[in-house]
Each structure stands twice: as C-alpha cells, then as structure tokens.
Curated annotation (Swiss-Prot):
Single Gene Ontology BP annotation: long-chain fatty acid metabolic process
Protein name: Acyl-coenzyme A thioesterase 1
Subunit structure: Monomer.
Keyword terms of this UniProt record: Cytoplasm, Fatty acid metabolism, Hydrolase, Lipid metabolism, Phosphoprotein, Serine esterase
Organism: Rattus norvegicus (Rat)
Domain of life: Eukaryota
Swiss-Prot/TrEMBL catalytic activity: hexadecanoyl-CoA + H2O = hexadecanoate + CoA + H(+); dodecanoyl-CoA + H2O = dodecanoate + CoA + H(+); tetradecanoyl-CoA + H2O = tetradecanoate + CoA + H(+); decanoyl-CoA + H2O = decanoate + CoA + H(+)
EC supergroup of this enzyme: hydrolase
Similarity section: Belongs to the C/M/P thioester hydrolase family.
Enzyme nomenclature, EC number: 3.1.2.-, 3.1.2.2
C-alpha cells in the first residue's frame, strides 16, 4: 500500500486558515519525517521539518500526533508552516505580491535520518492572500499612494487604514487578508514608494489626513469614522494620526512607540521632535547581534517627543510582545494608558503576549527574531520565541478583528431591504 499525504482544504487555502495534514498508508508505528518548504518572491527558501510516528493503523494526523523532534516538538498541527526558517540568515518572510500564492511543498520521508530517508509521498499546496472575490484597487488620489482591498459582497464596509513600519514601500498582505473578513482595508504607503519621499526625516500628518479623508469619503466605506491598524513605526504614526486628526474611531497599535523615533512628526504649526538615540546603550547579544531595546531616551525624560495622545477620542487596542527588543512596547502602551486616563479619557485595552517579539504578523508567519534595522544600519535582535510568538499571532489576529467589528459596526447580519 502506498502512502498518501492529504491536506484539508485540498489544493489551496488562505494564508491565515488552518490546514489539516494527514498521512495514510504507512506501516503501523512507522517513523517518518515531514518536511515543508516555500520560496518567497526573491527566491529565498524557507524550510521546516518534524519527526513523527504513525499510529497502530499506519495513519498520521498532525492534529493528534505530537512532533518528536525537528523544527518544533509537541502537538502543533501548523508547526510545519510557522516554524519555517530562512536559508538566508536574518531574512524575514513577507508577501510582496498578494495576487499570487505562496506555494508550499510538503514531503513525507521514511525514518528519522537527518539527511532524509526514502520519499514516501508529497503534496503541493497554495496559500493565498486574497480570498475568492476580494477586490484589489490601486489608489492614486492627490498625494495618496495606496491599495484598497474590498470584500467580495456589496458594501458599505467598515474602513481601516493599514500601516507598516520602517522600510517603507507598500506591503499589502495584511490588508488583503483582512478584506476577506468583511473590512474595506487600505494599505497605505508613506515613504520609499512611487513618487513619495525616499526618506523619512519628517513625517507630515497632512499626508495621512488626505488618506483618512479619501477612505472616509469612499462610497463603499461606512461611516462615520474609520479604523487604523499600525505595527512598529506604523503604530507610532497611527498614534499621531489619532492624536491630531478627526474621524478615527478605533485604532489597533501593534508594538508601537509613543515617542517620535528617528524623525520629526509635524502637523500644521506643531512639531514633535524625535527622542534622543543613546548609542552607548546599544548592547551586543551572545550571537553578535545588536540589542537596541535600551537605546532610546524615555519620552518621560524628553516630554516634547511624547505624542499628545490625550487629545484623541479614538478607542485604542494595544497588542504587545513582551519580549520585543526593537523598543519598549509594553512600557509605551502603559504610559499611553496612564496619559489617557489622567486626561479623563477611556482606559485602552492592552493585551500582552509573553515571549512574543516585535513583528506580530498575521497567523502562521514564521518569527523574524533578528534582522536588518534600517535606522540602526545593522542586524538587531527583535526578540521572541517561535512557539509563543505563533500563539500570539493567532490570538492577536482574532482580537483585532473582534475589536474592529465591535468599534466600527462590523458585519450587519440583517438582510438589507431592496430599494
């Protein structure tokens, strides 16, 4: 009897969907190795492997069988995806073109040999970033450079602006996945893209105001206000937008700073200067990486750098990796909470994830624990442990969707009357 490897859903799924992986037709109690691999658009290879043993019937179901070794151990039905590691050190998995899938190759090999035994079965599975029917609309309105993703069904939908961090460009994969959940999501570029500025010495909030007004005025976006989703530098900019601009009902900040970092933030005649970088506080890890977690002066010391969140009427959710080594995300979230409450504002929700690092991504993205930091100009540690980080990503994804549906009046379950 030949071994077969089956996946459910078969053939294709969305990146944030769980996969059921089963092997049948093995010898009872047979030791096997499962391997998974994918290549990103730049040709970089990501791989994971895990050792398993078939049950008494010669079957192996990853939802019931623990991994005995390899890239991860224990009961981890999605471990072969989230535990992938890049062949090139410090390479972060990002999706550059959401209109094509990541193609995952899975193999079942006989035995537990490190170099791999005889190939018993293989399968290829496509992990997509746009659910069927999701619409992708490039935006060039005034100065705004963005891509808007709309759900398949007729609108209007709750609107969200999605902001990524240092590096610039236009990353669309989080917005495209969220559009499959009933939101109109606009991935917004703000530097190093198209005809936008190449650097970010000054962040002018007027640009972001134009984006907010565009999205609020879109016929497929329901009002009155919109949501913001920002990670890292995008979280910092989201806080500035919520502080200075009207029309932002809800904001999710993932590991953001409450201080301006590496650039000035300007709005009209107001300027927030960046906090001082304390170069003598940069440490080296035992792996020879820079650890910059203590390298920023506290905004409590340099109050002028503190983004004036107390002006905001936005409802906030802070998602915090407690092992973030990019900067002190938990400290920042707590200081924002204190500042808001001191000014009679609503206490924000803060969810802390132990042993989670800086880049809390949509589910199943492998942990990027170290990599090039463009402000530092060197490889730094971003923190995090693979297993707890993967748990954090799964929970954070659910939390932010629940939050936005609640705050922005998400899925309306009634049937709209025919006009």
């Amino acid at each position: 009897m030949e071994a077969t490897l089956s996946l459910e859903p078969a053939g294709r799924s969305c990146w944030d969907e769980p996969l059921s992986i089963t092997v049948r037709g093995l010898v009872p109690e047979q030791p096997v190795t499962l391997r998974a691999a994918l290549r990103d658009e730049k040709g970089a290879l990501f791989r994971a492997r895990a050792l398993y043993r078939a049950d008494a019937h010669g079957e192996l179901d990853l939802a019931r069988a623990p991994a005995l070794g390899g890239s991860f151990t224990g009961l981890e039905p999605m471990g072969l995806i989230w535990a992938m590691e890049p062949e090139r050190p410090f390479w972060r998995l990002v999706k550059r073109d959401v209109q094509t899938p990541f193609v995952v190759e899975l193999e079942v090999l006989d035995g537990h040999e490190p170099d791999g035994g005889r190939l018993l079965a293989r399968a290829v599975h496509e992990r997509h970033f746009m659910a069927p029917g999701v619409r992708r609309v490039p935006v060039r309105e005034g100065r705004v450079r963005a891509t808007l993703f709309l759900p398949p069904e007729p609108g209007p939908f709750p609107g969200i602006i999605d902001l990524f961090g240092v590096g610039g460009g236009l990353l669309e994969y989080r917005a495209s996945l969220l559009a499959g959940k009933g939101f109109a999501v606009m991935a917004l570029a703000y530097y190093n893209y198209d005809d936008l500025p190449k650097t970010m010495e000054t962040m002018r909030i007027e640009y972001f105001e134009e984006a907010v007004n565009y999205l609020r005025g879109h016929p497929e976006v329901k009002g009155p206000g919109i949501g913001l989703l920002g990670i890292s530098k995008g979280g910092e900019l989201g806080l500035a937008m919520a502080s200075f601009l009207k029309g932002i009902t809800a904001a999710v900040v993932i590991n953001g700073s409450v201080a301006a970092v590496g650039n000035t933030i300007c709005y009209k005649d107001e300027t927030i200067p960046p906090v001082t970088i304390l170069r003598n506080q940069v440490k080296m890890t035992k792996d020879g990486l820079k650890d910059v977690v203590d390298a920023l002066q506290s905004p409590l010391v340099e109050q002028k750098s503190f983004i004036p969140v107390e002006r905001s009427d936005t409802t906030f959710l802070f998602l915090v990796g407690q092992d973030d080594h990019n900067w002190k995300s938990e400290f920042y979230a707590n200081e924002i909470s204190k500042r808001l409450q001191a000014h009679g504002k609503e206490k924000p929700q803060i969810i802390c994830y132990p042993e989670a690092g800086h880049y809390i991504e949509p589910p199943y993205f492998p942990l990027c624990s170290a990599g090039m930091h463009l402000l530092v100009g060197a490889n730094i540690t971003f923190g995090g442990e693979p297993k707890p980080h993967s748990v954090a990503q799964l929970d954070a994804w659910q939390q932010l969707q629940t939050f936005f549906h609640k705050q922005l009046g998400g899925k309306s379950h009634g049937v709209s009357p025919k006009i």
